[in-house]
């Protein structure tokens, strides 16, 4: 091997293509140095390209100048957006697809084609073309158009070389291939929130396509052709395809461009198949990515593609399954039912669930119980997707496994039957059109419980549901149960009628009890009033017997009546008894001189009345008195 390596290096050094290209590169470097000396502003221009641009809103200008700058900034963004792939996505959301660190260099020169050289010189020419492909350009502007064309042509020629080459390649070419792939592919993706604050929604917004896709696509093709080539040596490639390479590739799955995610899916599957030592690390990295998505970020663009790769990986698991794989199912895959973006990857997640049930049927119980526990109560669209997944998985479950979670399943189905959202109820009732599900329900062990659980909601739906199609489906479901076992159906219907009558009787009793306390209260009030009246009459009789002397003076109207338990004030009684009208007072004043003798008679008469009233009201304090 050492001798071959030395001979290979000697051949490369003696190659006329390499020598000519070296001379060309030296000349280009000298020209660049002269240009930089003559134009010192050119170097500043390259340095300026690496500085991140600020929006006009972030720079303190005067208002008129600031408005002008904002208009120019928006026009530049629109131009970049059109160059990046047309009218894809919202202009307010993002302006650039990805961020490359462009290398300042001159224009690339075209190298000879593979057809123009001998087969022995093609590996060295392939190495030169790979070096040319390591230059990265910004596709948001129209600069370096010649170099972009030269690079794209070199990439296409590399693809053709790898598809036709049947000779083993040297380790230096392995290093150069993966270096070129890393330079072109591994880049920071744009943030989800731009300065305008609008977030990308994968379900509603159109994705912004990658501006540099003409080059990136061919780079992916080079990598795939290189890994799939019959002369590919994993022992050499494992020095360059390591854990860091895998992590950087998994980070690219968050790209908005679906074309890139499709290539990443294929590439990751090839790496998993070729590099046996990386399989455990790839599964661990996928587990960490899923856990971050479920419990932290809740946003990722490539979950569906990763699950598709994972489905093929699970398909290759050996039976019986390892505890590691079972824990991966319970702690990583099943929690993927929680996020709101479940509709994006539900089909691939359901396929992974079905693969685990096929590999080990005993996993059906934890899978179904977990899905029923994570059932979305407030999201009708997600409920419909859950019902579809349940239908697919029930086709793989045996009668013995179904008996372990049938109670939870039947309870959830009754809730879905009675749902006010007609799509949920309709999708749940369509389960009875699946032969596998009907066979599970119609078995001897499950039919009695199923009919007892389903009869009431189906009967109520057939009568009172607001949607006509739901009423018709409920009636057809009842007919299906009737055809399976007529006798049992009649028994359960009679039980339902009896329970309905009992409920009506209970409701009537409750209404009667609610009205009964009101009548009892009215009776008690009447009795209390009667008792009070009797007590008042008795007290009056006692007072009349004890005060017989006052009854002789019935000529004078009584001025008082019972009112409260307070004692009687003699001064009040005297004031009331001595009350006279205004005419009497006026007449007394006018006749005061003539009636001096009568004044003594009046005072004596008033004192006699006061003494009589005091004697009449010498009663206990507990008696009630009022004044009229």
Swiss-Prot record:
SUPFAM superfamilies: ARM repeat
Keyword Chloroplast in annotation: no
Highest taxon above the source species: Eukaryota
Biased composition (Polar residues): 1-22
Subcellular location: Cytoplasm, Cytosol
GO MF: cAMP-dependent protein kinase regulator activity; GTPase regulator activity; protein phosphatase activator activity; protein phosphatase regulator activity; small GTPase binding
InterPro entries attached to this UniProt entry: ARM-like (IPR011989), ARM-type_fold (IPR016024), PP2A_B56 (IPR002554)
Gene Ontology terms describing biological process: cell differentiation; cell motility; chemotaxis to cAMP; chemotaxis to folate; meiotic sister chromatid cohesion; response to curcumin; signal transduction; sorocarp development
Keyword Cytoplasm: yes
Disulfide bonds: none
Biased composition (Basic and acidic residues): 600-618
Pfam families referenced in this protein's UniProt entry, alphabetically: B56 (PF01603)
Keywords assigned by UniProt, alphabetized: Cytoplasm
Role this protein plays: Involved in developmental cell fate decision.
Quaternary context: PP2A consists of a trimeric holoenzyme, composed of a 37 kDa catalytic subunit (C subunit) and a 65 kDa constant regulatory subunit (A subunit), that associates with a variety of regulatory subunits (B subunit) such as phr2AB (B55) and psrA (B56 homolog). The trimer may partially dissociates into a core 'AC' dimer equally active compared to the trimer. Seems to play a role in proper anterior patterning (pstO and pstAB).
Family of this protein: Belongs to the phosphatase 2A regulatory subunit B56 family.
Protein name, UniProt field: Serine/threonine-protein phosphatase 2A regulatory subunit psrA
Organism, scientific name: Dictyostelium discoideum
């Amino acid at each position: 091997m050492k001798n071959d390596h030395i001979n290979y290096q000697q051949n490369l050094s003696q190659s006329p293509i390499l020598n000519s290209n070296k001379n060309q590169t030296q000349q280009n470097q000298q020209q660049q140095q002269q240009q930089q000396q003559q134009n010192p502003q050119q170097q500043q221009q390259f340095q300026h390209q690496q500085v991140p641009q600020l929006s006009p809103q972030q720079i303190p200008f005067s208002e008129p100048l600031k408005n002008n700058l904002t208009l120019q900034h928006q026009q530049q963004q629109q131009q970049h957006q059109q160059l990046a792939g047309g009218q894809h996505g919202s202009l307010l959301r993002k302006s650039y697809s990805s961020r490359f660190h462009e290398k300042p260099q001159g224009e690339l020169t075209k190298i000879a084609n593979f057809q123009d050289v001998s087969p022995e010189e093609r590996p060295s020419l392939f190495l030169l073309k790979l070096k040319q492909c390591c230059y990265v350009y910004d596709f948001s502007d129209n600069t370096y158009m010649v170099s972009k064309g030269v690079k794209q042509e070199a990439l296409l020629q590399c693809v053709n070389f790898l598809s036709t080459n049947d000779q083993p390649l040297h380790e230096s070419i392995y290093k150069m291939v993966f270096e070129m792939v890393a330079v072109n592919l591994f880049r920071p993706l744009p943030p989800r929130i731009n300065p305008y604050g609008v977030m990308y929604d994968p379900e509603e917004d159109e994705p912004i396509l990658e501006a540099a896709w003409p080059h990136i696509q061919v780079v992916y093709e080079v990598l795939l052709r290189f890994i799939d080539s019959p002369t590919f040596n994993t022992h050499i490639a494992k020095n360059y395809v390591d854990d860091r390479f895998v992590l950087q590739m998994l980070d690219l799955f968050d790209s908005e461009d679906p074309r890139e995610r499709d290539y990443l899916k294929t590439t990751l599957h090839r790496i998993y198949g070729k590099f046996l030592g990386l399989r455990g690390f790839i599964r661990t990295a996928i587990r960490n990515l899923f856990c971050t998505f479920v419990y932290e970020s809740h946003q990722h663009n490539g979950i569906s593609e990763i699950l598709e790769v994972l489905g093929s990986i699970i398909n290759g698991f050996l039976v019986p399954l390892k505890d590691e794989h079972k824990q991966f199912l319970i702690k990583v895959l099943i929690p993927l039912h929680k996020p709101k973006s479940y509709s994006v990857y539900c089909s691939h997640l359901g396929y992974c669930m079905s693969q685990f049930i096929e590999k080990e049927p005993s996993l059906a119980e934890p899978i179904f119980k977990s899905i029923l526990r994570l059932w979305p109560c407030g999201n009708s669209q997600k409920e419909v997707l859950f019902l579809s997944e349940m239908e697919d998985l029930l086709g793989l479950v045996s009668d013995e496994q179904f008996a372990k979670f049938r109670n939870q399943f039947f309870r959830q189905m009754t809730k879905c039957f009675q749902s006010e959202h007609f799509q949920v109820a309709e999708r749940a009732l369509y389960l009875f059109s699946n032969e596998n599900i009907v066979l599970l329900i119609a078995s001897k062990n499950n039919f009695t419980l199923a009919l007892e659980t389903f009869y009431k909601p189906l009967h109520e739906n057939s009568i009172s549901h607001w949607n006509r199609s739901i009423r018709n489906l409920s009636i057809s479901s009842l007919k299906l149960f009737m055809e399976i076992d007529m006798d049992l159906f009649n028994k359960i219907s009679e039980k339902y009628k009896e329970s309905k009558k009992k409920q009506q009787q209970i409701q009537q009793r409750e209404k009667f009890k609610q009205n009964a306390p009101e009548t009892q209260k009215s009776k008690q009030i009447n009795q209390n009033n009667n008792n009070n009246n009797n007590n008042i009459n008795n007290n009056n009789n006692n007072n009349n017997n004890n005060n017989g002397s006052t009854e002789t003076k019935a000529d004078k109207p009584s001025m008082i009546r019972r009112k409260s338990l307070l004692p009687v004030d003699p001064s009040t009684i005297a004031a009331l008894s001595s009350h006279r009208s205004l005419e009497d007072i006026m007449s007394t004043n006018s006749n005061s001189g003539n009636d001096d003798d009568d004044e003594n008679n009046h005072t004596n008469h008033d004192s006699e009345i006061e003494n009589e009233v005091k004697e009449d009201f010498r009663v206990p304090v507990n008696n009630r008195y009022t004044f009229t």
